[in-house]
Amino acid sequence: MRSVLRTIAAVLILTGAGIAGLSAQQAPLPPQPGGFGPGELVNAGHQFFGTISRGLAQVIEKAISLWGLPNGYVLGQEASAAFVAGLRYGEGVLYTKNAGDLRVYWQGPTVGFDAGGEGARTMMLVYNLPSTGAVYQRFAGIDGSAYFVGGFGMTALTANNIVVVPIRSGVGFRLGANVGYLKFTPAATWNPF
């Protein structure tokens, strides 16, 4: 029992250290013209997740306080499983205000103190996206529930000044902290690398 408690404490400390590093690296951005406002994001999330949730609104507010207004967002679903090493696969639609909508797929490996599986509906806020095609790359970060309120978890992933903030709500059980990345592609693939 003590070893389980020590493992959980270590996971929480590692996750907290990773979150602090991500927050320190990303200074709050000024509001971007043409970005999606909090009301638009909460409404889209309400329609997608099925219920209006105070937890969803709080997670979106936290993301906006850290990174400003996103110029795109993805609505989709994903599945993941892990036992030390893990995999995540998902698909959805990237919505932008002035560049149209785009079907995207994502996949990625993880490694860390992690075990379990989950299926999740996912909303990803996308910041500093210069064009829709710029989403097709790897976004690295520390995965796990960096910020967790009312059944919604938020993490942050970055690549080439673009920030992707997945907000997940799902079923299943996955406990731990891990390091990994998400790779976005224009077509579904089983290869997470």
Give residue spans per PLM region.
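Bacterial N-terminal signal peptides that target proteins for export
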Residues: 1-9
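Sec/Tat signal peptide C-region and signal peptidase I cleavage site
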Residues: 19-25
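A detector of low-complexity, intrinsically disordered, Ser/Thr/Gly/Pro/Ala-rich segments
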Residues: 5, 13, 152-153
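Bacterial N-terminal signal peptides
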Residues: 8-18
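Small-residue-enriched, tightly packed secondary-structure blocks
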Residues: 25-193
